[in-house]
């Protein structure tokens, strides 16, 4: 079987390629060129020129073919432009989930299958993919819960699942690092990438500001009861649930409740005002057909590494899904992905509204 591995030049994807080769697969490496940014050594992003060099070194070390695909224009159109437009609307987008659908996983899996003749596409994500007796092919949380990345796959098209392999599904990060060291893989000591890959270590607001991608306008910070309590320095600097850095004096701590792009205001309130009994999402993507969903025991996640929140019911109108919490929970940020789970099984996801 011919398996293409998405190689980022990091430890995880390098070990994924190694493990597949050790199992006897016909392995090829594929690396995307998504950015021309050259970062300093203390900033780890992905898909940069240095990462391509690292991926080439690893592929050569493993003795596998390696291809570089220049999708910088596609990445700009599908991910960066989306990121900017969502911030213009006052939202807090999750570009990594969109990227996995539009570029790094969904699109690339189809590309290597059609163009390079690969039967399967593998990545170094900490995710499981299994056959379920009721749901069919499903994505599940990885064994290393601290590193689980299933949340970022919530927007994937269902027909891609049959192409995917995740060799690190049952491993921990520590075990993967140990394998890399034992096999003397050239990037075994490389640091992890934690940032949004195209911001080069900057916060989203800093990236938007420094690249003149968005006009930052100061506006009012308004208490949920209607009183103006301060000034904000631009909506991208704030997100729902934020408490620190508001610059507002009040009799008790205030939190960001909402960002109103039309009025250019940040709405704040006490913690109890942050609580809600539901969350809604649009353009919901069903990885498991909704008619197969269980009626109870489901949970939702509204950002990466957030603890799953139990829900008691869901309602669906067209492409809009609303989940109702078992008890009041803090609001989720608009623009993030709402992922729905049955235990460890990812049922689908949509964009929070």
Swiss-Prot record:
Gene3D superfamilies: Adenine nucleotide alpha hydrolases-like domains, HUPs, Translation factors
Region (Interaction with tRNA): 147-149, 303-304
Active site: 99, 197
Keywords: ATP-binding, Cytoplasm, Disulfide bond, Nucleotide-binding, RNA-binding, Transferase, tRNA processing, tRNA-binding
GO molecular function (one): tRNA-uridine 2-sulfurtransferase activity
EC number: 2.8.1.13
GO biological process, one term: tRNA wobble position uridine thiolation
Catalytic activity: S-sulfanyl-L-cysteinyl-[protein] + uridine(34) in tRNA + AH2 + ATP = 2-thiouridine(34) in tRNA + L-cysteinyl-[protein] + A + AMP + diphosphate + H(+)
Disulphide connectivity of cysteines: 99-197
Gene Ontology CC entries for this record: cytoplasm
Subcellular location: Cytoplasm
Annotated site (Interaction with tRNA): 125, 336
Coiled coil: none
Binding-site residues, ATP: 6-13, 32, 124
NCBIfam families: PRK00143.1, trmU
Family according to the record: Belongs to the MnmA/TRMU family.
Protein name as it appears in the record: tRNA-specific 2-thiouridylase MnmA
Organism (species): Persephonella marina (strain DSM 14350 / EX-H1)
Source taxonomy: Bacteria, Pseudomonadati, Aquificota, Aquificia, Aquificales
């Amino acid at each position: 079987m011919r398996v293409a591995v998405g190689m980022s030049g990091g430890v995880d994807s390098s070990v994924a390629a190694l493990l597949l080769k050790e199992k006897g697969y016909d392995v090829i490496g594929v690396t995307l060129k998504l950015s021309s940014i050259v970062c300093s050594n203390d900033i780890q992003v992905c898909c940069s020129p240095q990462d391509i060099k690292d991926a080439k070194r690893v592929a050569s070390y493993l003795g596998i073919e390696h291809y570089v695909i220049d999708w910088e224009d596609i990445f700009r159109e599908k991910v960066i432009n989306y990121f900017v437009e969502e911030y213009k609307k006052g939202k807090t987008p999750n570009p990594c989930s969109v990227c996995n659908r539009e570029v790094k996983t969904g699109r690339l899996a189809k590309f290597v299958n059609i163009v390079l003749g690969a039967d399967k596409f593998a990545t170094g994500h900490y995710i499981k993919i299994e056959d379920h007796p009721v749901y069919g092919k499903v994505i599940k949380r990885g064994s290393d819960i601290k590193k689980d990345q299933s949340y970022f796959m919530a927007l994937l098209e269902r027909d891609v699942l049959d192409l995917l392999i995740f060799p690190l599904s049952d491993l921990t990060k520590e075990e993967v690092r140990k394998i890399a060291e034992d096999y003397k893989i050239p990037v075994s000591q490389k640091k992890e990438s934690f940032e949004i890959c195209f911001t080069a270590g900057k916060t989203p607001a800093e990236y938007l500001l420094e690249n003149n991608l968005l006009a930052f306008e100061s506006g009012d910070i308004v208490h949920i009861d209607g009183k103006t309590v301060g000034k904000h320095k631009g909506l991208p600097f704030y997100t729902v649930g934020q408490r620190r850095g508001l610059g507002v004096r009040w009799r008790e701590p205030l939190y960001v409740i909402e960002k109103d792009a039309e009025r250019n205001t940040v709405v704040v309130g006490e913690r109890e005002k942050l609580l809600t009994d539901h969350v809604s999402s649009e353009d919901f993507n069903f990885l498991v057909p909704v008619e197969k969903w269980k009626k109870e025991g489901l949970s939702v996640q509204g950002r990466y590494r957030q603890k799953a929140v139990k829900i008691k019911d869901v309602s669906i109108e067209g492409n809009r899904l609303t989940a109702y919490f078992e008890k009041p929970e803090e609001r989720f940020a608009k623009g993030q992905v709402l992922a729905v789970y049955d235990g460890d099984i990812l049922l689908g996801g949509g964009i929070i509204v």
